[in-house]
């Protein structure tokens, strides 16, 4: 019985090694972004998050999309490893988030200290896969 379990486990590990791309990970974020503010959101992303991300070790790039049916922005941020992504302190992220919120609030004519105009709807982690073969 144990021999069968060990064999099954070895097969699963071998298969997972072929399917999983590597140690890479994708950070997934969804934000509530009204249609009338999509351009403001993109400009603020370009001014604040993009330059900061480009300086982070392990940052590979990101995809940005907008879902008009739900009025949500989606960001898929590609990292070389989960450890590199998670090594970034929450304090550093908060500084950039405040800068982002400030840029957006200024564009909307709101107080610099107003709450985040694009609330986080979902935060997740995805593993990239390769098709077998």
For the regions a protein language model found, what residue spans apply to each?
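Positively charged n-region of N-terminal signal peptides that target proteins for export
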Residues: 1-5
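Acidic/histidine-enriched, glycine/proline-rich intrinsically disordered or flexible terminal extensions
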Residues: 122-133
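An amphipathic, aromatic/His-enriched active-site/gating alpha helix that lines ligand/cofactor pockets
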Residues: 47-60, 78-123
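Short, well-ordered beta-strand segments in beta-rich or mixed alpha/beta enzyme
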Residues: 24-32, 61-92
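Boundary at the C-terminal end of the N-terminal hydrophobic targeting segment
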Residues: 19-21
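Bacterial N-terminal signal peptides
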Residues: 6-16
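N-terminal targeting signals for Sec/Tat export/insertion, comprising classic cleavable signal peptides
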Residues: 25-55, 82-83
């Amino acid at each position: 019985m144990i021999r069968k379990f060990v064999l099954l486990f070895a097969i699963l590990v071998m298969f997972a090694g072929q399917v999983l791309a590597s140690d890479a990970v994708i950070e997934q974020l969804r934000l509530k972004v009204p249609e009338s503010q999509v351009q403001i959101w993109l400009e603020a992303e370009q001014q604040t998050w993009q330059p900061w991300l480009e300086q982070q070790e392990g940052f590979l790039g990101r995809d940005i999309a907008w879902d008009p049916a739900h009025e949500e922005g989606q960001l898929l941020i590609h990292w070389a490893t989960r450890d590199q992504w998670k090594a970034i302190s929450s304090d550093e992220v908060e500084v950039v988030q405040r800068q982002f919120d400030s840029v957006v609030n200024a564009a909307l004519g709101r107080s610099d200290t107003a709450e985040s105009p694009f609330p986080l709807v979902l935060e997740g982690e995805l593993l990239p896969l390769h098709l077998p073969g």
